[in-house]
Amino acid sequence: MIRRTQALSLLLVAWLLAGCALAPPAGQPAAGGPRIANLRFDPETVPAGATTRMSFYFEVGGADLEEGFLIERGISQFQFYQAFQPIPVDLRSYSGQVAGTAEVPLRWNSLGVRILELYVVTKQGQASNRLRATLTVR
């Protein structure tokens, strides 16, 4: 009986984690739109209230990077959740650069495992491809 319960619990967790992948794939941006790559959090595991550094590589044809958006999904207190509003990230300090690596400090106060999806937008409103990375807050 215990093995069956453990197997069902494992199956449920796998099913919930697979649900994180139901969003559209991180495809290609529109022609002439910005591209991002290599999304990372350093460190990937942080204590609650501590700061982590999000970094990613970007290429923008018109050198007019405006802002980014983080879509937050995750598991916290044994519940799967998804944020209703994307979290805006100010990237105006990188305006004027055609390519480079952006580094943004982020702070999380609530515990849990987060799957964060990032995309950036230019001043003309062109959106980039989307990238995902995992961050654990303990």
Language model: regions and residue ranges:
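Extracellular Ig-like/FN3 beta-sandwich strand-entry sites
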Residues: 51, 65, 111-115
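Bacterial N-terminal signal peptides
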Residues: 9-19
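Bacterial Sec signal peptide processing site at the extreme N-terminus
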Residues: 20-34
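Surface-exposed, short loops/turns at beta-strand junctions within beta-sandwich domains
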Residues: 98, 107-112
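Extracellular acidic, Ser/Thr/Pro-rich low-complexity tracts
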Residues: 58-62
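Aromatic sugar-binding surface patches on proteins
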Residues: 92-103
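Short Trp-Ser/Thr-centered turn/loop motifs at beta-strand boundaries
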Residues: 128-130
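Short beta-strand segments of immunoglobulin-like
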Residues: 41-46
